[in-house]
Amino acid sequence: MPNLVLDPLLKKLQACLESDVAEPFLTVLLDAMAVAMLVDAKCRASIHGFEGRYVFKTPDKKVGATAVFGGSHMSVSHQAIDRPEPNVTVTFRNPKALMELLLSRTPDLIGAMLKQDVNVDGNLNYLYRFAFLARHLQLMATRCA
């Protein structure tokens, strides 16, 4: 059954994935993920009992966002907020590097760090969990398109 709130965001995410322009990727991904957690019981169940705070940013801080998980909900800020202390901070060279890392079938975090595409400060398991959620959302987007 179509969802009037989530489906347009999933289509926008799919358009980001199909284009070469990665700039809006982080914003679209986080917005779609937050809505999916609200309206989809399976997505909500995947974060049940999970508490985590993520900060994503570029080194120049021109692109940044914060995602907070808690109480089976997710909230998003479209800026990097370092207080209170995040569980993981991901500094990425550019939005394309972040997109490639998060949406890879087998995320090679160590390889991305060695290539200096990303720098991770905090618990790497949080990033792997986020990548899993992003891949799940990508699959939802391909089904919606």
Predicted regions, residues:
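Feature captures hydrophobic
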Residues: 1-145
